[in-house]
Curated annotation (Swiss-Prot):
The active site is at residue 76. Nucleoside triphosphate pyrophosphatase that hydrolyzes 7-methyl-GTP (m(7)GTP). May have a dual role in cell division arrest and in preventing the incorporation of modified nucleotides into cellular nucleic acids. The lineage of its organism: Bacteria, Pseudomonadati, Pseudomonadota, Alphaproteobacteria, Hyphomicrobiales. It is an enzyme of class 3 (hydrolase). GO terms for biological process: nucleotide metabolic process. InterPro entries: ITPase-like_fam (IPR029001), Maf-like (IPR003697). This is 7-methyl-GTP pyrophosphatase. NCBIfam families: maf, PRK02478.1. It comes from the Bacteria. It catalyses: N(7)-methyl-GTP + H2O = N(7)-methyl-GMP + diphosphate + H(+). Its cofactor is a divalent metal cation. Keywords: Cytoplasm, Hydrolase, Nucleotide metabolism. Disulfide bonds: none annotated. Pfam families: Maf.
């Protein structure tokens, strides 16, 4: 295949998912202010799914304009509990508060992936996972945060299901790749349709 693929993310985990799938690509960071993009969206009543898609698209478009001819993969994930939207916690106290809010409830992860070339969107997709946390007491939350440390601050929701964070959950409805922030199977299918990968 001669199409250059670029992942518009410096996330080592997203890179690892693509590498493990046998995809050849480079990475580049998008130059966008995510909070500035999403604030008016929420004010206008956009859903968390819409926001994830728009942010993924903004990243893909930005990087595609700087990489002529390349097909760029943009990704984003939002987490919502009812009408409340959550971001990565900025400190351990914020992580503790998030986990207390999620305790015994079902929140939603919205993972978007977009393909763009030369500033134009080729394809967009959003997958949703429903995550039900078990009832967590304050002592367990404190021990969990002590165990995972700064990993809690690098993830929306203060957890990684691929590590000790899985112990927080009672039930999960959704695809693993949606949960970790890159809907891989729909992405691979579209990359094959676009003749970007063999298939």
């Amino acid at each position: 295949m001669t199409v250059k693929l670029v992942l518009a993310s410096k996330s080592p985990f997203r890179s690892a998912l693509l590498k493990n799938a046998g995809i050849e690509f480079s990475t580049a960071s998008a130059d966008i202010d995510e909070r500035a993009v999403e604030a008016p969206l929420y004010e206008s009543g956009a859903t968390p799914e819409d926001v994830a898609q728009i942010l993924a698209e903004a990243k893909a478009i930005d990087v595609s304009e700087k990489n002529p001819g390349a097909v760029v993969i943009g990704c984003d994930q939002t987490l919502s509990l009812g009408d409340e939207i959550f971001h990565k916690p900025h400190d351990m106290e914020a992580a503790r508060r998030q986990l207390q809010k999620f305790s015994g409830k079902t929140h939603q992860l919205n993972s978007a992936v977009v393909l763009a070339r030369d500033g134009k969107t080729l394809w967009r997709h959003v997958s949703i996972a429903h995550m039900t946390m078990r009832d967590l007491d304050a002592g367990f939350i404190g021990r969990y945060l002590g165990r995972v440390g700064d990993i809690a601050l690098s993830n929306v929701g203060a957890y990684q299901v691929e590590g000790p964070g899985i112990q927080l959950f009672e039930k999960i409805d959704g695809d693993y790749f949606t949960i970790v922030g890159l809907p891989l199977l729909p992405l691979l299918a579209e990359l094959r349709r676009e003749k970007c990968i063999d298939g």
